[in-house]
Amino acid sequence: MFSKDKLANMEVYNDINGDLVNLFRCVKFHCGELQKELSFMLNSREIFYGFVSQYNTRGMTDIQRAARFFMLIKTSYGSDHRSYGCVKRNVNVMTQYLTDIQERLSNVVIENKDFEDLLKVYDKGDSLIYLDPPYYGTERYYQAQFSKEDHVRLCEVLKNVKGKFILSYNDCEFVRGLYKDFNIDEVQRNHNLMGKYKDKDHKYSELIIRNY
């Protein structure tokens, strides 16, 4: 949604993943320093696994941590950031668009909160809330823990929001049952990971759930 033009008077980005939030904050407030840090990095298997081994190392600055996390995102296979992707990527090309992202984030509030705590602060009658929780049944692939109870808790919280919400989920019986009282649309999406490594389209079903 941040790739679209800014239309709202106020925008809030929230993620429970502290490393992702740190990356966004560094792009917003220290973009030049982050790009400089990244300019010394290479796309290689050895460096990738070096960053993996340093993942929880203390003593790094926020910029150093953000640069390593950025490289793990861009050069990994899948979303676990633990397996090298063997994909040809030019680091300088990857970092060029960070300046555009910095400009886009200039007036965005960046938070690192549990969804329930966040909505207590920002849910208003004129709010439009987009939520992208972990797909049900795939939680082990995410760094931030999200349990079955959290999926249920999210649904209960959304039943009482004042604003409008849009929720994207994987298409499964559990999710359809949980949100049966809301508007559910099924859409087809390209499987970007499969398309990246194979010269063919791979599609899967996703649910778009709304309270309006």
Where are the model-predicted features located?
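Conserved SAM-binding loop of SAM-dependent methyltransferases across substrates and taxa
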Residues: 1-9
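Long, positively charged, glycine-interspersed low-complexity recognition regions
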Residues: 147-212
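A short helix-to-beta-strand connector/capping loop
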Residues: 9, 103-108, 180-182
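Conserved SAM-binding loop
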Residues: 24
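Short alpha-helix immediately C-terminal to the canonical SAM-binding loop
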Residues: 21
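Conserved SAM-binding motif I beta-strand of class I
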Residues: 10-15
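SAM-dependent nucleic-acid methyltransferase catalytic core
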Residues: 18, 28-141, 160, 172
